[in-house]
Each structure stands twice: as C-alpha cells, then as structure tokens.
Amino acid sequence: MTRSDVIAAIATPPGRGGIGVVRVSGRNLQSLALKVAGCVPEPRRASLTRFRDENDRVIDQGIALYFPAPQSYTGEEVLELQGHGGPAVMNLLLASCLSAGARLAQPGEFTLRAFLNNKLDLAQAESVADLIDASTEEAARCAIRSLQGEFSNAIHTSVQALTDLRMLVEASLDFSEEEIEFISGRELEFRLEHIRQQLEQVFSAARQGSLLREGIWIALVGQPNVGKSSLLNRLAGEEVALVTEVPGTTRDVIRQVIEIEGVPMHLLDTAGLRETEDAIEKMGMARTRSTIDKASIVLLLVDSRVGITPEDQAILASLPPGLRLIVVHNKTDLLESPPNSTVSTATATADIWVSAKTGAGIGSLQQGLLEMIGWQPSTGEGAFMARQRHLSALTAARTHLEAACALANSLDQVELFAEELRLAQLALSSITGEFSADDLLGEIFSRFCIGK
C-alpha cells in the first residue's frame, strides 16, 4: 500500500438505500472522472451525469462532485459519485472506478490520508470513528467536540506550557556555569502547578468521555425468581426478557443496552444461581459466572421481604474482589415501609430498595449507578471522546509531571527534572499524533469502516 495512489470505496452502508456514494481520492483524478462520469465536474458544484462501466455502458445516472486538493476531506483530490443505493449499482460503480485505475481502499484509509496531510490530528481522526459508532446522543455530541478540535486544543495547551518550561530548564543546563537565572524557584513552582491543574481538568473531561464511549457493563445476578428479568424490563422500558413464576426461566445471558443521562449501560440479565441437576440450567449458570468476571458493576437482586439469605452470602463470597456492587432489594411493593437507599462511593457498594413491578426506587437505582461509575453531569457537558490509549497517555503524563515536581527543588537533579518534563510532553504528544509509531497508526485506522 502506498499513500499517493488513487483509492476508491463505497462510502455508504451496505444494503438498499435511496442514495449510495462511491468515494475516490488521490492524484490526477481528471482521467478517472472522464472515464466513469464522462466529465470533470466543476470544483465543489454538483453535476448531473451518467456513470459508465469500462465498456462505456451506462450503469446509473447520478451526481458527481469534485474537490481539488487541498480543499477536501483527505487533502488530496476527491471525487464523490452519488448514485442509487442498491448493492448491484454500487458494486458496478466501484468496479468501474477500479478498472479506471483506482484500487480498493483499506479500512480507514481516507481518514488516514487526512491525518497524513494534516487535515486532522490523530485525536480528531479517532473521533470520526467514534462519531459513527456513538450509541447515545450525548456520546455523539462528545465525539463532535473532539472532531472540532476541543480535545486536541486542550492537549496542545499543556504541551506548549511544557515546551516553554523545558526551554528555560534546558537553557539553565546549557549555561550552568554562567550566573544567569533563567527561571526563579517561585516561577517554576507556579508553572508546574498550572500545568498540573490543566492536566487534571483534561483527564477529568477525558474520563467522562470514555464513559460515554465505552459505556458500563452491568451484570444482574441473584437467586432464581427474585426479579432480575422484571428489573431488566423495567430499566429497558420494554419487555425484553420472559418473566414467569417458574424458577430458572432464564437459561442464557440476555443483553440490553439502555442509557442513563447519555451514558450507555450494557445490562446483562443472567441465569439464577442455585443448586440444580438440570444440565441446561447448569450451563446457564456457568455463563453467569463468566459474565460476572467481565462486568464493571454487579447488581445482586434479593427479595426485600427476607433480606440477604445464606444463598445470597454464598453469591457475594464468589464475586471477584474489588468489584463494584449494588445490592438491589426488590419487591418493596410488598413491604409497608421500605428503608432508604444508600450509596457509598468510597467502598463501591450500595443498597437500593426498588419495586421492579411498580417502578418505585428505579430513579434511585439509576442515580446510584451513575454515582458508582463517577459520572459528573457538569463535566460531561464538556467531555472529550477519549479512548483507553488517551487515558493511559494522560496518566503517564501526570506520573512524569509528579516526578518532576518532586525533583523541582533539587539543584543537583536538574537533568532528571528536565527528562521527566520531556517524557510528560512525549506522552501528551502521542494523543494528537505529533509522535506516533507506524504500528500504532495501523492499529487505529484498521478499525475504521471501509470508505471512511
């Protein structure tokens, strides 16, 4: 694969649709445009034309758009051919482009070229895929903020502050024998604290964005017939799981995605845990335990009329250590006066009293889930769509900055101090792609859809 040849791909989803788009990018597209569209469209103006195959037979009639370099998505010449969105028509139109000299684009190659041509930085490029994959409105808003450069601008601000500070520190090293004070101790302390505060704000916004992107996985566990499926249906707002009076009805894991304040919640209704000789039910319980291992939060449902039983205690004892846990006391509609719900973020535990039948206490459960994951609505409104690699880079930058702060007052440790600043800057620069290995770029863009 080269980065200067002509590439083409169907840019719209597979299947039938009113409109389908074939996108072409590269150099000297006039020849291809003449062969396929019969004309070279006027830049940035829609041209109605007939599309033809390699034997000059008419494939379709549609719109051709031409964007000259560098005023295009990729920074190269771009030709977009809009035809009727049937699979046969789109495949014929793509084949015509390939026979005219293009090759099939790799997944994410259009956006990769936009990155390589400085139309987008790496964080913005990733936000393109995140915007396409957004499962909630808030996640989509968060992704567009990153695409517009808000995340990148915040990173650039911290990188520039580190660059300015490094310049003064490096000057002190280069002219250590001269009686010149390039930066005072007070100024150094002020700048370090300012950068630290900047990083904390960026990390907080990025973490909120990560919740919007990844969501949270929640396993509903408990003994048979305590209301797990009823609670799933109540949270989902529809009947997605069968509810009966017969214990052991749920044999497999049922997954349902809901959103609470824009945060995707992946609910996993599991088979009830109990002693049984039923082979199929045993298989369901084995899947339940596997699901628990993958979950971020476990909702342990118990019957509020009897409280936590020895069987429930056995389930609690089998949970992985450190797992966030909410004990959901269900069927409060059968109690005269249920206790108040409590949430402890310090211990990552909560006791919530609900009625899956009437909906009482469901609001408290939803808020408890948000508190448990550390969701902050005020921060979420300005969140950046962040991936795990972004959080890892920010964490590394914070670690190196803390190490630099610890060395700031050691006159004989100036070189180590300067190195920690450099490493912090390097970690931040990897987010926007100012410093990124080729294998990282390949990993990122390979996850895009073809045609983007």
From Swiss-Prot:
Which residues are listed for Mg(2+) binding in this entry? S229, T250
Q: Does the keyword Transmembrane helix apply?
A: no
Return the GO cellular component terms, semicolon-separated. Answer: cytosol
Q: Which UniProt keywords apply?
A: Cytoplasm, GTP-binding, Hydrolase, Magnesium, Metal-binding, Nucleotide-binding, Potassium, tRNA processing
Question: Which cofactors?
Answer: K(+)
Q: Keyword Transmembrane on this protein?
A: no
Q: Which CDD domains match?
A: trmE, TrmE_N
Q: Pfam families, per this entry?
A: MMR_HSR1 (PF01926), MnmE_helical (PF12631), TrmE_N (PF10396)
* E.C. designation(s): 3.6.-.-
Q: What PROSITE patterns does the database record attribute to this sequence?
A: G_TRME (PS51709)
Give me the comment on cofactor binding.
Binds 1 potassium ion per subunit.
State how it assembles: Homodimer. Heterotetramer of two MnmE and two MnmG subunits.
Q: What is this protein called?
A: tRNA modification GTPase MnmE
List the source organism: Nitrosospira multiformis (strain ATCC 25196 / NCIMB 11849 / C 71)
